[in-house]
Amino acid sequence: MKKIIFVSHCILNTASKVVLYNQEEIDAEENLRIKFLNKAISNGIQIIQLPCPEFTLYGAKRWGHVSNQFDNTFFRKHCRKILEPIIDQLKEYLENEDFFEVLGIVGVDGSPSCGVDYTCIGNWYGSFEGRTNLQDALNTCKLVKAPGIFIDELKKMLDENNLTDRVKVTSLFAPEENKCLDIIH
């Protein structure tokens, strides 16, 4: 029986991530990402990469965002569109449980899109030009206990397809590394 795990796009392709600058956070996430992937590969787990909604909508040269910037009809519709084939794949694997075991889906906590338990919010909008309170706006960014928009839509689609009880959704998050490591067996 083949074991399968679905992962956020940047778990396999960090080039898709927005440019980061906090080296300590980068290193902690990278170490866990490598540990997670090594464990998955050494256990013979098949890895399916989810699409990145930010990259497929905004490309590589995008600014960092917070989840409340993505909490709109247009971004949610984009997420659903790119998730439709993923839901179809999940259903097909689950319908053939004699051959496949779906271990779950792994997001990336802290992401405005792919956070499972944690996402970032802030009062960010508007132009940078002439803005006198830019630092005040940037300082509103904080980590909160809530899903990112892509994962929120994914969970809704799992529920709409009666898959919620059959598909575990967890995350890669350096401060809580067992969340992603424990899903692999």
Regions from the language model: what does each represent?
Residues N43, A60-N68, N72-D98, G126-H185:
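Divalent-metal-activated hydrolytic enzyme cores
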Residues C10, L103-P112:
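Short, well-ordered beta-to-alpha junction loops that form the rim of enzyme active sites
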Residues M1-K2, N31-Q46, I86-L103:
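Short amphipathic alpha-helices and their capping/turn segments at secondary-structure boundaries
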Residues K2, N13-A28, L138-C141:
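Residues lining hydrophobic/aromatic ligand-binding pockets adjacent to catalytic sites
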